[in-house]
């Protein structure tokens, strides 16, 4: 099990060895700094804490600055923790780069999906609309609600209009197509959540081979 934090650059396409065009997402993986190593003996579980992105020291509070100084790294914009079976080979202050993964690896990628604001039930929940003809009084509404004397209330969980998107989404079992070590790029097959420049968490797939 291993993981990195990266930033989505965008999508493009590549040719595989058979000449087939495949859609790919390019992810920039700046050097990830290990800010803390957690062990079962000390913390109850094995994990590494990774810092990503630069931030001005003036914008870091004293406890956080002490945490970064202890690890011997410059202040980082975001921190992410990855649970591991073993922390052997990891030390505080160590830099992790794109070559942590290799072509052919399967990964799970998590990010915050694009926000779409307040949306109705047709766009938000994929419901069917009513007839659009002149005689119909029902077009794009949510449908049956609280009925009459019974149940005379709207059931919890009823699919209604509301805020859509801007939530944590994980896409599983994406294949790493190419690793560009010189430019710190990770190229994966398919689409990943979020807008361009959005932060992504890349983990070893938990469903490998399934």
Curated annotation (Swiss-Prot):
GO terms for biological process: translation. Pfam families: Ribosomal_L3 (PF00297). Keywords: Ribonucleoprotein, Ribosomal protein, RNA-binding, rRNA-binding. One of its GO terms (cellular component) is cytosolic large ribosomal subunit. It comes from the Bacteria. GO terms for molecular function: rRNA binding; structural constituent of ribosome. Belongs to the universal ribosomal protein uL3 family. Part of the 50S ribosomal subunit. Forms a cluster with proteins L14 and L19. One of the primary rRNA binding proteins, it binds directly near the 3'-end of the 23S rRNA, where it nucleates assembly of the 50S subunit. This is Large ribosomal subunit protein uL3. The gene is rplC.
């Amino acid at each position: 099990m291993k993981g990195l934090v990266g930033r989505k650059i965008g999508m493009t396409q590549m040719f595989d060895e058979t000449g087939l065009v495949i859609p790919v997402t390019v992810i920039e993986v700046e050097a990830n700094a290990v800010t803390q190593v957690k062990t079962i003996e000390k913390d109850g579980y094995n994990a590494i804490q990774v810092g990503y992105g630069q931030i001005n020291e003036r914008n870091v509070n004293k406890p956080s600055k002490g945490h970064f100084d202890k690890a011997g790294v410059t202040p980082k914009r975001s921190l992410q923790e990855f649970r591991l079976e073993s922390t052997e080979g990891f030390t505080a202050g160590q830099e992790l780069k794109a070559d942590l993964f290799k072509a052919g690896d399967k990964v799970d990628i998590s990010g915050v999906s694009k926000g779409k604001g307040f949306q109705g039930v047709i766009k938000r929940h994929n419901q069917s609309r009513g007839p659009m003809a002149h005689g119909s009084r029902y077009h794009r509404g949510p449908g049956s609600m609280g009925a009459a004397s019974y149940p005379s209330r709207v059931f919890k969980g009823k699919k209604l209009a509301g805020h859509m998107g801007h939530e944590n989404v994980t896409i599983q079992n994406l294949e790493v197509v190419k690793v560009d070590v010189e430019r710190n790029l990770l190229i994966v097959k398919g689409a990943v959540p979020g807008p361009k420049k959005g932060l992504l968490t890349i983990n070893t797939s938990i469903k490998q081979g399934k």
